[in-house]
A protein has these predicted regions:
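A short acidic, Gly/Pro-enriched loop at the edge of an enzyme's catalytic core
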Residues: 188-203
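Conserved S-adenosyl-L-methionine
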Residues: 74-188
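Non-catalytic, mostly N-terminal accessory regions of nucleic-acid modification and defense proteins
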Residues: 1-76, 83
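Conserved Class I SAM-dependent methyltransferase catalytic core
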Residues: 157, 163-165, 212-278
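SAM-dependent methyltransferase catalytic-core segment centered on the flexible catalytic loop
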Residues: 115, 119-139, 201-202, 207-234
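Flexible, glycine-/basic-rich loop-and-beta segments that form/coincide
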Residues: 58-63, 67-68, 270-272, 277-281
Length: 281
């Protein structure tokens, strides 16, 4: 409920329940407030009321693959938004050098590989319980046959074996581990792993200001990025707002500038999304 009203949300719930009971009174429909098959939703926004059915039955923003988690793991929806904000195209070469639990690379693989996030959740959809006269097995089979898992060039690197393992396991649960290359790689070795100007997009969630060696890490990160990133490539970072100026300072040292910037919220935490490009020298 959004807006100022002279009633409470519980009042709306009561009225909605009364309406449903009256509506289905003579239709041989069992109404059970605890053991239910169909969830009805009521949204009151200022002077308007929207009444509908929950077709999903579960939170569509949740990612079932997120089992092995880094303490500072990104939400899947935010990671996906970061990938799209970067300008990443499906056939491009993408690198996440601070992969943590792999969420950015996994979301990029979903997009680039044309693989549905909810592929393994089909049996959980609430609309399967609705009597719509639809053969849902045939419905999903028709969609599944279109899935090709297009070959991708996505690299998920971290300097700790633990998080490389986390990334690989989460990707396997997601069903797209074959679309990502996983490896334990130190920042200093990126110019050995990749040829000069061979990467289209670097997309990552770098270490925060709690790290004592942050200056050294960012300096090395932008130094390596300047070598492996194509001239028209981009670096897309998500960080705490308090770290953004520090990041920009090190980016400037290696001739990168901010081409666009946005603020996003993860719960009550404000995060900064910055997209960097190379300066024309």
């Amino acid at each position: 409920r959004i807006g100022a009203h002279d009633f409470k949300s519980v009042d709306v719930e009561t009225k909605a329940a009364e309406f449903m009971i009256k509506k289905f009174k003579n239709r041989n429909v069992k109404i059970d407030m605890k053991n239910f098959d169909i969830i009805f939703l009521v949204y009151v926004i200022n002077s308007k009321c929207y009444f509908g059915i929950d077709f999903a039955g579960f939170a569509l923003n949740k990612r079932p693959y997120k089992i092995f988690l880094h303490p500072n793991s990104l939400r899947g929806t935010i990671a996906y938004a970061l990938v799209r904000e970067s300008g990443f195209q499906k056939k491009e070469v993408m690198l996440d050098p601070f992969s943590r639990d792999g969420v950015i690379a996994i979301e990029a693989a979903f997009y680039a590989g044309d693989f549905p996030v909810g592929y393994y959740n089909k049996e959980k959809f609430a609309f399967l319980k609705l009597k719509l006269g639809i053969d849902f097995d045939r419905f999903f089979d028709k969609i599944d046959k279109k899935i090709k898992k297009t070959k991708t060039k996505i690299y998920s690197y971290d300097h700790l074996f633990k998080y490389v393992d986390y990334s690989r396991k989460n990707a396997k649960i997601a069903g797209i581990d074959k679309l990502i290359s996983f490896s334990r790689v130190e920042l200093e070795w990126l110019d050995i792993k990749f040829k000069e100007k061979s990467i289209d997009r670097i997309i990552t969630n770098p270490p925060t200001s709690k790290n004592a060696n942050l200056g050294k890490i960012y300096n090395e990160f932008f130094y390596q990025s300047a070598y492996i990133l194509k001239d028209n490539g981009t670096i897309s970072l998500i960080s705490r707002v308090s770290d953004s100026d520090f990041i920009k300072k090190h980016a400037e040292k290696h001739n990168f500038f901010v081409s666009k910037e946005n603020v996003v919220w993860s719960g009550e935490q404000q995060l900064n999304v910055s997209v960097f490009k190379k300066k024309n020298i």
